[in-house]
Amino acid sequence: MASELKKVALVTGAARGIGLAAATRFLDDGWHVAMLDILGDTLRSTVNAFDRAEATLALEADVSDPGAVQAAVEQARRQFGRIDALVNNAGIAVFKPLLDVTLEEWQRVLAVNLTGPFLMTQAVAPIMRDQGGGAIVNITSISGLRASTLRVAYGTSKAGLAHLTKQQAAELGEYGIRVNAVAPGPVDTAMARDVHTPEIRADYHDHIPLNRYGLERELANAICFLCGDQAGYITGQVLAVDGGFDAAGVGLPTLRNERRNQ
């Protein structure tokens, strides 16, 4: 068992992307990290690449499966002795017009994106309560704060997660457990680079005051801040890490282009 002086984070969806960036930042800050993902082979390769066997643990599990969640959380507790932070990052998306989304697709997205964080928190919170507190960060999305096309299931699941965050904060605060959410805007992940054409990226840039995509490490910085002592009086908040995307409203590309050309 690792020293109890080391803080421990459990990060879901940790095999790649924002989850991996958060796990990396925790390790850089001296934490031990249990990394959970449904992509077992990718996860194990990622964990092996750290070459930090004493500080890392790979947990293959589906966050929508109650039994798998309980088993994974118990394995993390046995390995490290405690869990100080939970990052509910695992998520999936279906991008289709509303009338084309099937019931099965709708249910699967909500199962992973909303029920998953519920199950993970139900499993981890008693451990945090018994050790005197902890921090939970749910990864929602700008799509949960403002409607958009082609993401009825995804956006609805993330809006629900934003409210779940506040509900958890209201009820778990008495145990010293803080619960917040990070709502990413467009992020320069490998997936985004694969599916966002130059035209799509230009459209996003026009609506983002900082005129660029966010970086995975910038999301990790926000996550780790909310899990740390400097955020000790912050709970029940949804922090948009989006370059101003949510604040800006509708872009006016023609006016902006004319101004730039003056």
Residue ranges and their predicted role:
Residues 181, 202-234, 241-243:
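C-terminal helical subdomain
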